[in-house]
């Protein structure tokens, strides 16, 4: 909470992250439609609309929708190919879906009065756990027990290998935690700072500085939204590469 004496200014930067039901004021259950549900659905709808508009009636001179769709497709495809190799191309649809959902959800959260779904650890944790479970299953299906060689650093001195194995196992199971907190933390922090500057814009004495600050931070948040989608996706590719080629 922040208050300004004598101006009646009161603003709560963290209120924008409150999950509330779409209908009524009752308690939120796992089946309750909420603002999170709404904005995730809007993100999915926006992605579907973009891809349908971008792939229907493709022309030699592409439309804006086609250009954006092809740019996103080519960008993620090259990322998957460069990081995971040819073996990882078959998992491109899953990784592309992750990238587009996070990117569009981040951008929708920049609309005034909207809700940033990726600022909630509950959302990012599900995405990170899905990645963790998927790459682990792929690792065992493709390599069998050989997947466990990911934790055994054969190039290290023999005396250090057991210690390094413990460290590798711990770091492996910490992956979904860091994967989810990184995205949620960055999105929440940026939006909270933006809200603070927007609140101070109501104070005449500092309004010009606050407005300039809002504009600068908003531009930075656009960049952060894209970067965080990229970071989440490229880490997914790195984890997938470990599953496909676990040998150190």
Swiss-Prot record:
Keyword Cell inner membrane: yes
InterPro entries documented for this protein: ATP_synth_F0_asu, ATP_synth_F0_asu_AS, ATP_synth_F0_asu_bact/mt, F0_ATP_A_sf
Cited Pfam families: ATP-synt_A (PF00119)
UniProt entry tagged with the keyword Membrane: yes
Molecular-function annotations in GO: proton-transporting ATP synthase activity, rotational mechanism
GO CC terms, sorted: plasma membrane; proton-transporting ATP synthase complex
Main location: membrane
Keywords, in A-Z order: ATP synthesis, Cell inner membrane, Cell membrane, CF(0), Hydrogen ion transport, Ion transport, Membrane, Transmembrane, Transmembrane helix, Transport
Compartment(s) where it occurs, according to its Swiss-Prot or TrEMBL record: Cell inner membrane
Membrane topology: Multi-pass membrane protein
TM regions (residue ranges): 34-54, 91-111, 121-141, 147-167, 197-217, 220-240
Disulfide linkage: none
SUPFAM superfamilies linked to this entry: F1F0 ATP synthase subunit A (SSF81336)
CDD domains: ATP-synt_Fo_a_6 (cd00310)
PANTHER family the UniProt entry points to: ATP SYNTHASE SUBUNIT A (PTHR11410:SF0)
Function as written in the Swiss-Prot or TrEMBL entry: Key component of the proton channel; it plays a direct role in the translocation of protons across the membrane.
Quaternary state and interactors: F-type ATPases have 2 components, CF(1) - the catalytic core - and CF(0) - the membrane proton channel. CF(1) has five subunits: alpha(3), beta(3), gamma(1), delta(1), epsilon(1). CF(0) has four main subunits: a, b, b' and c.
Family label: Belongs to the ATPase A chain family.
Protein name: ATP synthase subunit a
Gene that this sequence comes from: atpB
């Amino acid at each position: 909470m922040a208050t300004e004496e004598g101006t009646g200014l009161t603003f709560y930067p963290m209120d924008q992250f409150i999950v509330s039901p779409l209908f009524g004021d009752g308690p939120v259950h796992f089946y309750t439609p909420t603002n999170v549900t709404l904005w995730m659905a809007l993100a999915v709808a926006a992605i579907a609309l973009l891809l349908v508009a971008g792939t229907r009636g493709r022309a030699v001179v592409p439309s804006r929708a086609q250009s954006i769709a092809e740019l996103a497709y080519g960008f993620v495809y090259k990322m998957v190919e460069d990081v995971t190799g040819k073996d990882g191309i078959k998992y491109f649809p899953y990784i592309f879906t992750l990238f587009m959902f996070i990117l569009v959800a981040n951008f929708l959260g920049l609309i005034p009065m909207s809700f940033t779904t990726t600022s909630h650890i509950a959302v990012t944790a599900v995405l990170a756990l899905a990645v963790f479970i998927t790459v682990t299953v792929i690792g065992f299906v493709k390599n069998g027990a050989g997947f466990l060689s990911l934790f055994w650093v054969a190039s290290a001195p023999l005396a250090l290998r057991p210690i390094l194995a413990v460290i590798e196992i711990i770091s492996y199971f910490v992956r979904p935690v860091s994967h989810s907190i990184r995205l949620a933390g960055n999105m929440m922090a940026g939006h909270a700072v933006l809200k603070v500057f927007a609140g101070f814009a109501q104070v005449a004495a500092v309004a010009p500085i606050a407005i300039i600050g809002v504009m600068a931070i908003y531009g930075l948040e656009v960049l952060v939204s894209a970067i965080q989608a990229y970071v989440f996706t490229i880490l997914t590719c790195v984890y997938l590469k470990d599953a496909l080629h676990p040998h150190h």
